[in-house]
Amino acid sequence: MSKTPWALGLLIFLLTFTSPLSSSPVRSTDNSTSSKGLLNVNSSVILEPSILPSSASKPESLHLSKVRVSGLRLEAHASSTENIVLGHNKKHNVVVVPNKNVRVVLFGQNFQDIGALTFTADGSCKDLAHFFEADFSSMTPIRVVVEMSFPKTTESKDSFKLCVSEKFYANPQFVIVEDPFTMVTTEIPPVDEYMPKWLSWICLLILLCFSGLFSGLNLGLMTLSPYELQLYIASGTEQEKRDAGRILPIRKKGNQLLCTLLIGNVVVNVGVSLLMDQLVGSGFAVLVAATSCIVVFGEIIPQALCVKLGLPIGARTIPITQVLLFLMYPLTWPISKVLDIFLKEELTRSLERNKLVEMLKLSEKSIIGGQSDEFKMVLGALELYDKTVAHAMTRYEDIFMLPHTLTLGAGMVTQILDMGYTRIPIYENDRKNIVALLFVKDLALLDPDDNHNVMKIASIYNHEVRRVLVDMPLRNMLEEFKRGEYHMALVERLVEQEDKDPIYELCGLITLEDIIEEIIQCEIIDETDAVCDNVHRKKRQRKRNHDMSQIVNTAHAKCAINIQMLAVTIQVMSTCHKIFSSNYILPTILEKLIRKNCKKVETTQFSCLKEVGVVQPKPAVLFTKGEFSNKFIMILSGRAVVTIGKEEMRLEAGAWHSFGTEVLDAMAEAIERSLNQSTSRSTVSLNTEITNNSIGFIPDFDTVILYECVFCEITAADLLLAYNSSQIMQNNTKMQVVRSNSRISLIEEIPKDAVSTPIRNGSVKLRTVSEGETVHLLPKNMECHFNKQEKYEEEEE
């Protein structure tokens, strides 16, 4: 009794499993002439498989007992260059090109039990060729490969379904696999359009414009450095100033601006490619069309425009740039900060001097149109840094010098004045042995008929002889001249000697004018130039001067007063202050001093002063309240108006009224102090006091001339000149020649215990070269250049 339920259950299971197979009709062998008959492996009988309709849910698992089909893949032949397999449609069916041979690869299980397979579009499993085991290109239990082609589908037959039959059945039947992943269609689905074509063309044009904008701004804005924009703001035109002012705040966000433009450019270029794929189609045509549009309209044209018009284009697109910076701020700000950390922030670097010089030379023709004077000056000032004294000095062979034995007669003074020099070196025996300097102004009050010796005059004034090395930079020499102590220096070089200490040999002379010539790149004919060009040594072409003997002939010198007024003026001045007495200034020198410094103001010069508020001419202003003055003035005739005090009380000063007696007192005290010093230092100290404005006063009144007036104006320098001239006249026969033993040089003093080669550091020091050292160091004597001139003068006399 216990076995009855189990037997009943087994019977029910067998009936259930075999009932579908027995219910399907068996196809006869009448259709054995079809495309391919079914080959039964276990028997020689050829049977046509019948069709078993599949159910809706997993037919392969319900109706195929052993075979399981998991999916399929379609492949084109390796030799085929055409794209045959087009992918999947929305139904997940594989899309292929119709009537093209493809390889169908099936994946699953128990494929060794497949008896036949085919594809059907109408559900009959007879509309395409059947494939048996012998027709398989490759077969494994999990993989089967067949080669076939699919005809073009119609609207009613839109896809091909897989039909599979198993072996080892008396009545083999096809089972249709309803899985959409195993279905094949030759109907090419329409391309999904993002938008209508007319709207796509409009968007394409807009994206191309933005691509060009990003590309152009990337080149135009990033090449405009903040330094260059500041130059436009400072020195550009009004339009350039406005444009640069708008761009500068945006341009300072260097890395953030760069990231914004690059990201925007990449995004719009990708959008152009997608729209081209929709409008033109896929394949090589899209590649050519997208590349051509991006390169031509997005790169070449905008960058060519922004290279030349970067400033105006960048200024007019600032609103768009600001919007893009705002929209992309969350993305670009972190990237820009990372770039700032690793690459540092963008620095505003100016051009180095050497690069600036080369840039000016390269842009000479294109910008300035040739070497104009302004261009030469700028270039000369920049090149001054690399030049030394040797580049600008006048060689010693071309220097106008005087021998120390020369006698200054009337004819010789005339010749010296005819040369046009104001500072003349004096040499002793050898032209390389310069011992003193003579200023032509020192001869102003001397009588040429007294035949003074040039060395005696130079010893009285004792002008310092400055010496520098030949390799001294011109910029340092210019700084020395700018201090105002001297504007001329001798140039020496170090000469090595065997078994002896090195010596310093004269090789030229440098003046402030020579440095200015190097700056302005133009030759200036000064008192040291015997040649017109220091480089090419071109001789000066002098114009014939007028008769200079009238300068030294005082008998016919013009004066603002007559002889009677001159005599009275001499008498008044000699008694008004001790500085005008014969103890300081000789009467003959005083006469020349008064003649030289008398001035007359005509009434016609004040015809314009009738109007109120007119500025007075310079000759009419004698003293200004609060301004330093170093002159003494005596009214000889006429009247001057003096304004005194806060109330501006006005007084008139008539004839023989004097102003500036403080200058006379200070000068007398300075002379008395100098008498207590050595002869070589007395004149130097007086010159130093006058140069430093130590002799003078600050008036607390204003003095102007409103009417016709004659007055005598004598400065502290005139008083010193008159005093020195008087000393020369008094000691003409007794004076002992004092050579310059205070020749100041920029060469360091060499210690006796030092090595033979002197060592110099960067500091500028002064040293005193004694006469004995000079005579010992300098070479042999040279002939006097003025011997022939003296003989010629003696013959004329």
Curated annotation (Swiss-Prot):
List, in alphabetical order, the GO biological process terms annotated in this UniProt record: determination of adult lifespan; innate immune response; magnesium ion homeostasis; magnesium ion transport; positive regulation of gonad development; positive regulation of multicellular organism growth; positive regulation of vulval development; response to magnesium ion
Question: Can you list the disulfide-bonded cysteine pairs?
Answer: none
Give the sugar-modified residues: 31, 42, 676, 692, 724, 731, 761
Topological category with respect to the lipid bilayer? Multi-pass membrane protein
Major localization listed first in the record, in broad terms: membrane
Q: Which InterPro entries match?
A: ACDP, CBS_dom, CBS_dom_sf, CNNM, Ion_transp-like_CBS
Q: Which residues lie on this side of the membrane: Cytoplasmic?
A: 222-255, 302-322
Q: Where in the cell is it found?
A: Basolateral cell membrane
| Observed phenotype of the null mutant | No visible phenotype. Double knockout with cnnm-1 results in increased levels of intestinal Mg(2+) and reduced levels in other tissues. This Mg(2+) deficiency in tissues leads to a reduced lifespan, 100% sterility, and smaller animals that exhibit a developmental delay with defective gonad development and which therefore do not produce oocytes or form vulva. In addition, the gonad development defect in the cnnm-1 and cnnm-3 double knockout is rescued when the AMPK alpha subunit aak-2 is also knocked out. Double knockout with cnnm-2 results in 22% sterility.
One cellular-component annotation, GO: plasma membrane
* Residue ranges constituting the CNNM transmembrane domain according to the UniProt record: 193-373
What tissues has this protein been observed in?
Highly expressed in the intestine and in neurons, but it is also expressed in a variety of tissues including the pharynx, hypodermis, rectum and in muscles.
Q: Which residues form the CBS domain?
A: 393-454, 461-527
**Keywords in alphabetical order:** CBS domain, Cell membrane, Glycoprotein, Ion transport, Membrane, Repeat, Signal, Transmembrane, Transmembrane helix, Transport
- Which molecular-function annotation in GO is an example for this chain? transmembrane transporter activity
Topological domains (Extracellular): residue ranges?
Answer: 24-200, 277-280, 344-797
Signal sequence annotation: 1-23
Task: Give the PROSITE patterns listed for this entry.
Answer: CBS, CNNM
Q: Please give the start and end residues of each transmembrane region.
A: 201-221, 256-276, 281-301, 323-343
The record's similarity note reads: Belongs to the ACDP family.
Q: What does this protein do?
A: Probable metal transporter. Probably acts redundantly with the other metal transport proteins cnnm-1, cnnm-2, cnnm-4 and cnnm-5 to regulate Mg(2+) homeostasis. Promotes postembryonic gonad development by regulating Mg(2+) levels, probably via AMPK signaling.
**Protein name from the UniProt record:** Metal transporter cnnm-3
The lineage, from the top, is: Eukaryota, Metazoa, Ecdysozoa, Nematoda, Chromadorea
Query: Quick one: which gene encodes this?
Result: cnnm-3
